Regions:
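Electropositive polyanion-binding surfaces
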Residues: 29, 180, 185-187, 204, ...
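A short macromolecule-binding patch
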Residues: 93-98, 159-165, 662-673, 677-679
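Charge-lined substrate channels and their catalytic hotspots, especially those that engage the 3′ end
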Residues: 1-284, 291-337, 368, 373-376, ...
């Protein structure tokens, strides 16, 4: 055995025994060093390790690992390439953890660790000495049988070792089934594998329903509704009582409509409009009165708290509330009398709010519109989408279409609101969204882009106005007074470092932007950039990088305003069927209207934090369902060649996004065989050492679809020549 072979074995032996004194005898026995030359070589290497402060001499013939500094705590991050790390609680700089020092911790585990003495020419390393709390104890994957041995194949590949499932713990699971498995025995020094038991068999991998439920299970999201919650929903009466009518404003005779996606079933919101005296318009924003039917602390409410949001996968909705409530009792369906919580505005022709009131109402929607229907009506009356201009004056015979006067007036008022919002410093992000049409088996047959049009923006502006007004009604108080507790939707200013990264990035495309100055100046600079790149090849890429520079919006009782919307006060009031924070806001507004005291801050901040977390988890699941359908769609197009652009660059290859459908795949580094390429992280490019050829973010590129891996939701591309 050479020095080069023996040194790593000695390092691993000491690293695996932190705090333990190892005598020469222990070391020789552990490493099977039974000849005099090998023993002397080991002693020489240990002297060098002690000189490097990697180990400490305890006696003349014993050493122990040098654990430098105090023991700390942090969160473990496992990587498939072996570059594991720990994020210490008191730092934002991760510390490298070699696999041999990981104690087989998994991503998200809270661990206790000690920093090891840094060896010459080595990066800072840590040793996990205790796993304090497991991030999760259930995993989702495919059951794989090899003779009598069953293991769980996880698509994420971030397990330290295999999960073995004894036959008696399979719960009927068969080879090739997707399953949810709970760990019953974690690894230790004697047994490196995890032992698990099947808690739910999802079904045969590849089946659409099974794969969608698998995505939900991977994020710990529900794919079934508890029976007791469904039963509780069945007992709720939809009847509107004489007391309800007496206590509410009656809007049943005022023109009211809903405008939603064509496949929507849960109608959260409706708009009413009528002309008042003195040239004013009364616009009612009517929201389903969920809190009337869902009592705080009930089994339905507890389940809604847990879920916090509805989840929208490509081919299905997993509702926050039981179907009887979200699609029937609460939903503002046409020609049915419904209870609503409403914000009623008196607006002048310029959409200035002259007065408002927040009241409980009874409404009766006259018509259920799809966005496409309203868009068609607007366009046939002279509206040019995206210009911000309302319909021209009505011709002699009047506007064309059912309820055209009302809808065109709503559009005109909405456009005034929108113009004022952007003038006030709101940031404009109009992104295309990838959508799929699927057949009866869930298979994608067509992909297309959806862009927000004037009909969508009509609804958006009135919802924003209602949300802002409700937030102001509680949060805006006289100087010296404390506002009552309310969950706000807050959005912090962008991260200055990320903004500078964005500025450096867009310069490469010939764009300029300012990253300093007031919030308004920054918003103006961002909007100028968005307008300048509109319609260009790099538009989607620049919007993606710009969005990464933004902070994430979240819920909090501590109001800091909303940067993106340029609102000092903002909340979520308009979607209680699909968002729990809206239900919280409804309850608190009712409580305060009835003279109630301010609600408990700590309790509501906890609910806000949970809602923000669940919103992010749901968004991740939704993205995964889109990825799955994109890979499934492209799996029938393997071998096809497409125009694309480089959307991401890593040390292991280049990510490319197909121009015609935004499906993304990887050209692995091994396929770039005309040169050896170095990764220039600062300039977002790969540079060839010999020929200096560059692959840069945003560059056009021609690719061929090489393979589609549904289990991993990954596409692999190869280069297909120059454009």
């Amino acid at each position: 055995m050479t020095k080069k072979q023996l040194a790593p074995k000695l390092e691993e032996l000491f690293a695996s025994n932190p705090g333990k004194t190892l005598s020469f005898k222990d070391i020789f026995r552990s490493l099977h060093l039974d000849t005099h030359p090998l023993k002397m070589l080991a002693i020489d290497i240990m002297e060098e390790m002690a000189w490097d402060d990697f180990i400490t001499r305890v006696t003349d013939n014993s050493y122990q690992l040098n654990m430098k500094g105090q023991v700390q705590e942090g969160v473990f991050q496992r990587k498939t390439n072996g570059k594991n790390s720990i994020m210490p609680d008191d730092s934002d700089k991760p510390i490298f953890v070699a696999e041999r020092n990981s104690m087989w911790a998994l991503t998200g585990d809270r661990v206790r660790f000690a920093c090891m003495a840094r060896r010459k020419n080595h990066i800072k390393e840590a040793q996990v000495i205790q796993i304090l709390e497991r991030a999760k104890d259930t995993f989702v994957g495919r059951l794989s049988f090899d003779h009598d041995l069953c293991t769980l194949i996880s698509p994420s590949n971030v397990l330290a070792n295999s999960i073995i499932i004894p036959r008696r713990k399979l719960k009927g699971g068969k080879d090739g089934d997707n399953a949810v498995v709970r760990i019953v025995e974690w690894p230790d020094q004697d047994h490196r594998n995890m032992i698990g038991e099947v808690v739910d068999v999802l079904g045969k991998a590849g089946n659409n329903d099974v794969e969608m439920n698998t995505i939900l299970a991977q994020y710990g999201l529900p794919y079934k509704y508890p029976k007791n919650v469904e039963e509780a929903a069945e007992k709720i009466s939809a009847e509107i009582t004489p007391k309800d009518y007496a206590e509410r404003e009656d809007f049943r005779d005022v023109f009211t409509c809903t405008i939603d996606p064509k496949d929507a079933k849960d109608f959260d919101d409706a708009l009413s409009i009528r002309q008042l005296k003195d040239g004013l318009w009364e616009v009612g924003v009517h929201i389903a009165d969920v809190s009337h039917y869902v009592t705080e602390g009930s089994v339905i409410d507890k389940e809604a708290v847990k879920r916090a949001t509805s989840i929208y996968l490509v081919d299905r909705t997993i509702p926050m509330l039981p179907e009887r409530l979200c699609n029937f009792i609460c939903s503002l369906r046409p020609d049915e009398e419904k209870l609503a919580f409403s914000v009623i505005f008196n607006l002048d022709e310029e959409s200035n709010v002259k007065a408002y009131r927040i009241v409980h109402t009874v409404i009766k929607s006259n018509r259920r519109y799809a966005y496409e229907e309203v868009q068609e009506l607007l366009e046939q009356n002279g509206v040019v989408d995206g210009t911000g201009e309302p319909a021209p004056a009505a011709p002699k015979g009047g506007y064309k279409g059912e309820n055209a006067d009302a809808l065109i007036m709503l559009d005109r008022l909405a456009k005034k609101l929108r113009a004022a919002r952007f003038k006030n410093g709101a940031v404009r992000f109009d992104r295309e969204e990838l959508h799929f049409d699927v057949d009866e088996k869930g298979k994608p047959v067509r992909c297309y882009f959806k862009r927000s049009k004037d009909a969508n923006k009509l609804i958006e502006e009135f919802m924003l106005l209602a949300n802002r007004t409700v937030a102001e009604s509680v949060g805006k108080v006289a100087k010296g007074k404390k506002p009552k507790t309310l969950p706000y939707r807050v959005h912090d200013n962008p991260d200055p470092t990320k903004l500078e990264t964005l500025r450096e990035f867009v310069v490469k495309f010939g764009y300029k932007m300012k990253t300093d100055g007031t919030k308004g100046a920054l918003a103006k600079s961002l909007n100028t950039l968005m307008s300048a790149c509109e319609g260009k090849r790099e538009q989607n890429l620049i919007q993606t990088v710009a969005l990464r520079a933004m902070m994430k919006a979240k819920y909090s009782i501590h109001n800091i305003g909303h940067f993106g919307l340029a609102f000092d006060y903002y909340t979520h009031f308009t979607s209680p069927i699909r968002r729990y924070p809206d239900t919280m806001v409804h309850r608190l507004i009712t409580r305060y209207q009835q003279g109630g005291r301010s609600a408990n801050k700590e309790h509501y901040e906890e609910l806000c934090e949970h809602s923000s977390e669940m919103e992010q988890v749901a968004a991740n699941a939704e993205r995964d369902s889109i990825k799955y359908k994109a890979v499934e769609f492209m799996s029938e197009r393997v071998g096809n060649v497409y125009d694309a652009h480089i959307s991401g660059i890593q040390s292991y290859g280049i990510y490319c996004e197909i121009d015609e459908n935004h499906c993304e795949g990887l050209v692995p580094m091994r396929d770039l065989d005309d040169d050896y390429y170095d990764f220039d992280e600062r300039n977002y490019c790969l540079v060839g050492r010999r020929h200096h050829n560059k692959y840069q973010l945003g560059d056009p590129i021609r690719i061929k679809v090489a393979s589609a891996n549904l289990e991993k939701k990954q596409l692999d591309f190869t280069l297909a020549g120059d454009l």
